[in-house]
């Protein structure tokens, strides 16, 4: 009799692709809405010099809420929703790469590491231009200039709204840097997210496997998968946060050199500057990763081909 503690990974060939994509887009959108405020806060914390404006995640949350209201926590959100495309490309690349690597290695760690890195490469190629625009929108604060660019305002001093701001930022990027400006920080993004993704998946499966041995046989897999996700996210965040800080500064401040940005950060703020925004990153990653893991594993189970439904333990 099959041991229910054994986690059977649902692979690409087991899925009903139509269900997978329809459910996947809806799930991703819900996650984006829930975690976007902390993404915005993390971006502002990483770009500010020292503690010139915000003294931490909670302080930033309160100040933004008081100054701009709830909409202030969602600056750039409409533009950021276009990353839904990259999200679907990510999961497709991940699953197809796992299938390809399986022909050469049955090690789940190897499959997860290679697939995670490959998926991130594809996704970042789509995401970076969207991130560049949305990050500049995140830095708009009641007409005050926090980044390189500032949207034009109306007579009352308020910035133009929605896609008016977006078009204004796009024009300024084009004037300042040309088309290359939309891929500013591309290499830094790859150096951040490829390792992050490559590390997250093996740690996720490792933690899930270890927890499965500690839990009773009757414990639903989804429980220890939900715990494993945040553990893997925290591990990956700690390892990759220094590069994430540098990536954000390169993209928002318009710097051309990763090395010079690193040196300037070290000179101004020391080694602790590399950990800026880490708490916001982990705070945003914890609930979002639980939702992602529960959602993604449930999505795959709901998308199983009919003849395989009874063969998977929840």
UniProtKB/Swiss-Prot annotation:
MF terms from GO for this chain are:
branched-chain amino acid transmembrane transporter activity
What reactions does this protein catalyze?
L-valine(in) = L-valine(out); L-leucine(in) = L-leucine(out)
Q: Where are the Solcar repeats?
A: 18-100, 107-210, 220-302
Keywords associated with the record? Amino-acid transport, Membrane, Mitochondrion, Repeat, Transmembrane, Transmembrane helix, Transport
Membrane-spanning parts: 20-42, 71-90, 113-133, 185-201, 222-239, 278-296
* Primary location: mitochondrion
- Topology in membrane: Multi-pass membrane protein
| GO annotation, biological process | amino acid transport; branched-chain amino acid catabolic process; branched-chain amino acid transport; regulation of cold-induced thermogenesis
**What InterPro entries does the database record attribute to this sequence?**
Mit_carrier (IPR002067), Mitochondrial_sb/sol_carrier (IPR018108), Mt_carrier_dom_sf (IPR023395), SLC25A44 (IPR042164)
Recorded superkingdom? Eukaryota
- Spell out the PROSITE patterns in the cross-references: SOLCAR
Q: Where is the protein situated, by its record's location annotation?
A: Mitochondrion membrane
Q: SUPFAM superfamilies annotated for this entry?
A: Mitochondrial carrier
Tell me a GO cellular component. Answer: mitochondrion
The family annotation for this protein states: Belongs to the mitochondrial carrier (TC 2.A.29) family.
Q: What does this protein do?
A: Mitochondrial solute transporter which transports branched-chain amino acid (BCAA; valine, leucine and isoleucine) into mitochondria in brown adipose tissue (BAT). BAT is involved in BCAA catabolism and actively utilizes BCAA in the mitochondria for thermogenesis.
Q: What is this protein called?
A: Solute carrier family 25 member 44
């Amino acid at each position: 009799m099959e041991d229910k503690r054994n986690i059977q990974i649902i692979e690409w060939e087991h899925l009903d692709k139509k269900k997978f994509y329809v459910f996947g887009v809806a799930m991703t959108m819900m996650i984006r809405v829930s975690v976007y405020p902390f993404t915005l806060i993390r971006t502002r914390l990483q770009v500010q010099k020292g503690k010139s404006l915000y003294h931490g995640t909670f302080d930033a949350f309160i100040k933004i809420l008081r100054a701009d209201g709830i909409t202030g926590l969602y600056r750039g959100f409409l533009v950021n929703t276009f990353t839904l495309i990259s999200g679907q490309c990510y999961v497709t690349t991940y699953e197809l790469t796992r299938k390809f690597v399986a022909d050469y290695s049955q090690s789940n760690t190897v499959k997860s590491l290679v697939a995670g890195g490959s998926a991130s490469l594809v996704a970042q190629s789509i995401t970076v231009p969207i991130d560049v625009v949305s990050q500049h929108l995140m830095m708009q604060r009641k007409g005050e200039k926090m980044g390189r660019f500032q949207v034009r305002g109306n007579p009352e001093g308020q910035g133009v709204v929605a896609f008016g701001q977006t078009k204004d930022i796009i024009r300024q990027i084009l004037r300042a840097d040309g088309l290359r400006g939309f891929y500013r920080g591309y290499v830094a993004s790859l150096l951040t997210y490829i390792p992050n993704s490559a590390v997250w998946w093996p740690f996720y499966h490792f933690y899930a496997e270890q927890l499965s041995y500690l839990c009773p046989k009757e414990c639903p897999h989804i429980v220890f998968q939900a715990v494993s996700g945040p553990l893997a996210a925290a591990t990956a965040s700690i390892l990759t946060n220094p590069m994430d800080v540098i990536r954000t500064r390169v993209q928002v401040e318009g710097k051309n050199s990763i090395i010079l940005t690193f040196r300037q950060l070290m000179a101004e703020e020391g080694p602790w500057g590399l950990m800026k925004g880490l708490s916001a990153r982990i705070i945003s990653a914890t609930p979002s990763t639980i939702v992602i893991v529960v959602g993604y594993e449930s999505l795959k189970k709901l998308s199983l081909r009919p003849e395989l439904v009874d063969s998977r333990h929840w």
